[in-house]
Regions:
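N-terminal basic, low-complexity leaders that serve as flexible interaction/assembly modules and, when applicable
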Residues: 2-100, 136, 315, 344-359
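Generic detection of long, well-ordered alpha-helical segments
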Residues: 11, 60-61, 124-127, 185
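Exposed alpha-helical structural elements
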Residues: 13-17, 43, 52, 114, ...
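Short, flexible, mixed-charge acidic loops at enzyme active sites
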Residues: 44, 94-109, 160-171
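Short glycine/proline- and acidic residue-enriched helix-loop micro-motifs
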Residues: 49-52, 112-122, 177-184
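A short acidic, glycine/proline-enriched capping/turn motif at secondary-structure boundaries
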Residues: 85-88, 103-104, 112-113, 154-156
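A gly/proline- and charged-residue-enriched helix-loop-helix capping module
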Residues: 101-139
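Active-site loop segments of alpha/beta catalytic cores
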Residues: 126-359
Length: 359
């Protein structure tokens, strides 16, 4: 594993996001987009014809190349390493395949009976290829923008690992929460341990921010407040505390973002978990978010479908969103990942609309 403390990376030129998180005023509102290196880009689609999804994730040179695609094409204020939240289940011994038009499929889902078979020893070490991709990308960015690392949150990963992929109900994984609580906590602890080690690996490799996704397929949305408090909150808090403690030991400053899609019921509690930024989906108004979170730094929350609007419409929706949040303590993003059929032109307009806001 590359150790950041022994690296000499180029100085950062665009620190808008980091300034906002520190409470300083940037020259322009910062913006990046979840899945910004993705199928909406023709260049990415051509690249995918040559390489499978996990081949890209597991090959540092390829992951670096894809990560840089949107940075070279657009005026984004951050890059996010090209990877997937399911690399952790892979490291634990699950067989994960990305099927076209289906999404991820896990051939050997976790059950109560095979829980002991997870290969927990050295799991994070088996993800060194992500660290290598981060180091390579950080160098090739040459300080243009900061680089974000990420991981899936424990409940999100648990859902995939038990269901064997995405689900309309998550009934198999929720069954554990009601009928097999001891085993559920055991699996969540296993995942939390690996996530912490994995995030530190990313920091040591050069990640300048970290995002935790409790969001894929609306996983937090499938829980009520009671379940979120018991099966998400303690583990999310432990991740924030332990990762931040280890970052401090490294004498580094790496902010952490929590994005728990569909968890409006827990926004006030999320503020106390120790994350620097709270990600917001598009199904709650910015004004309501500010009433709940006050001056907490937030990230979001344009409806991805707003990018289907006319250029004038996109600008109007951006203005309305920013009016609700205010220009302070805000990192602009979509309320979830960008969709494959969206246009690069719409993304350009989105970015320009954000950067044109007078602070």
């Amino acid at each position: 594993m590359t150790d950041l403390t022994k690296q000499d990376f180029p100085p950062l030129k665009n620190d808008r996001i980091l300034k906002v998180i520190k409470g300083e005023e940037p020259d322009k509102l910062p913006i990046w987009v979840m899945r910004q290196a993705g199928r909406y880009m023709p260049k990415f689609r051509e690249f995918r014809k040559l390489h499978s999804f996990f081949e890209i994730c597991q090959t540092p040179e390829l992951a670096c190349e894809v990560t840089l695609m949107p940075i070279e094409r657009f005026d984004f204020d951050a890059a996010i390493i090209f990877s997937d939240i399911l690399v952790i289940p892979q490291a634990l011994g699950l067989e994960v395949e990305m099927k076209e038009s289906v999404g991820p499929v896990i051939k050997n889902p976790v059950t109560i009976e095979n829980l002991n078979d997870l290969n927990t020893e050295g799991a994070a070490d088996r993800l060194n290829y992500v660290g290598e991709a981060i180091t390579l990308t950080r160098k090739r960015l040459n300080g243009k923008v900061p680089l974000i690392g990420f991981a899936g949150a424990p409940w999100t990963l648990m859902g995939y690992m038990i269901e064997g992929g995405g689900s309309k109900t998550y009934s198999k994984s929720k069954k554990w929460l009601y009928a097999h609580e001891t085993e559920a906590h055991r699996l969540l602890k296993i995942l939390t341990d690996v996530i912490i080690d994995y995030l530190i690996l990313q920091v040591k490799s050069g990640a300048q921010l970290l995002q935790i996704f409790e969001s894929t397929n609306r996983n937090a949305e499938y829980l009520n407040e009671y379940l979120f408090d018991r099966f998400c909150q303690p583990y999310l808090q432990r991740i924030a505390i332990e990762v931040k403690n280890k970052i401090a030991e490294l004498k580094l400053d790496v902010p952490m973002i929590l994005f728990a899609k569909g968890s409006h019921y827990s926004l006030e509690k999320q503020k106390s978990l120790g994350y620097d930024v709270i990600g917001i989906d598009w199904t709650i108004s910015p004004k309501t978010v500010r009433q709940i979170l006050g001056d907490q730094v937030v990230q979001g929350n344009l409806d991805p479908c707003a990018l289907y609007a006319s250029p004038e419409g996109i600008r109007a929706h951006v203005d309305e969103m920013i009016k609700g949040f205010g220009t302070g303590n805000l990192v602009v993003n979509l309320g979830h990942g960008i969709y494959p059929d969206m246009s690069e032109e719409a993304v350009e307009i989105f970015i320009d609309a954000v950067h044109s806001v007078k602070l």
